[in-house]
Amino acid sequence: MAMLGAEEFGFATSALIVLGCVMMRKCHMNTCPVGVATQDEELRKRFHGRHEYLVNFFTFLAREVREYLAELGYTKLDDIIGRTDLLMRKPSDHIEKHDLLDLSRLIHLPEQAATQTIHQVTRQLHAIDNVKDVDIIRHAKAAIESGQEVSLDYAIANTDRSVGAMLSGEIAKRYGNIGLPENTLHIKFKGAAGQSFGAFLAHGIHFRLEGEANDYLGKGLSGGLISVRPPVRSNFDAEKNTIAGNTLLYGATGGEVYINGRAGERFAVRNSGAIAVVEGVGDHCCEYMTGGRVVVLGETGRNFAAGMSGGVAYVWDKDHTFDYFCNMEMVELSLLENSTSRKELHELVRQHYLYTGSTLARTMLDDWNHYVDEFIQVTPIEYKRVLAEEQMRKLQQKIADVQRDY
């Protein structure tokens, strides 16, 4: 690959095999028989991989590469990058189809290679000096440095990627994970946001998007608030249309997201603390979720809650078909029978209406006693057991305190 021009190489699968992977292709099913890709405690006991195995593997790999380089008369990998003239085609194996292959264009070495370097010698220019975050940071200086409330307005296009990441980085430099005080920085955007809108958004920032968003909205969300709604003049039903892409809230640890419309696949994958309300999702929603709350006011795709080990999801099951779309290996379904869950769901739907003006949320709130009975609560079995044990521990402590006082 180096001779064909590669300068970076991936070893993911081979490294997993060194650690014991037997390629059963069950990584997504939580049934890995050797404990590499599973949350099952019994299966994880079967994992016998050690870091020394990886050290040995890459040491021997590097040694073999050095030996091949020595055979060719070179001392560094850089010396052979792009050197297609060093490649030779195997002799014919007399298979007619193989003889028809013309590899000349693949292994062609340009004339410029004799006078110019054909491997990387200068760092890539990422051109981040003029991205939108630079302007936001400049205008939000009062909020960042002294905590004053600041409101800003921007147009946004799908070429504006990772908006909010550099801003949150500036805040993290000063305040760490604490972020800014509540409701310090309000920024309204209009347009189609690019990928990773609101990535790693820090506490105290509210991004309000009027338009639509691409994939990875709220990636690594760290306490910020993002609300998305269709353009004010749009005439379509928001709850029937997708206005945000795939893999939203990937790895989020905190914060809130309210979307007045549907989202794509893998919504809230690896969410570990954020709150989200959306009006429909694609496949694999809440995949590997470990914490937080997710409310789906609409249809879901298949494989809902696969690998979900923490947090709680509430799904509006108006057609009574949700159990077909839910992966039941690690979760259980129930109606909202206790007042705590009902109050929590009501508050989340109310907040969704306040931030997005959702027509669907308003309809539900106006006839709450009817709609609340159509919701299904999704709770991880192990998570529910831990909560029950914690409640029992608190009850026992309370009884012990009463007995001590008397």
Where are the regions a protein language model picked out?
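Flexible glycine/proline-rich, aromatic-decorated loop/lid segments
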Residues: 2-43
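Glycine-rich, histidine-containing beta strand-loop boundary motifs that form or position
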Residues: 12-15, 76, 211
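Sliding clamp-binding short linear motifs
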Residues: 12-15, 19-24, 90-110
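Long, distal/terminal scaffolding or interaction modules
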Residues: 42-47, 51-72, 81-84, 105-406
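Short glycine/threonine-rich loop-to-helix capping motif typified by GTGT followed
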Residues: 1-5, 85-98
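Compact, charge-rich alpha-helical regulatory domains located at protein termini
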Residues: 77-80, 87
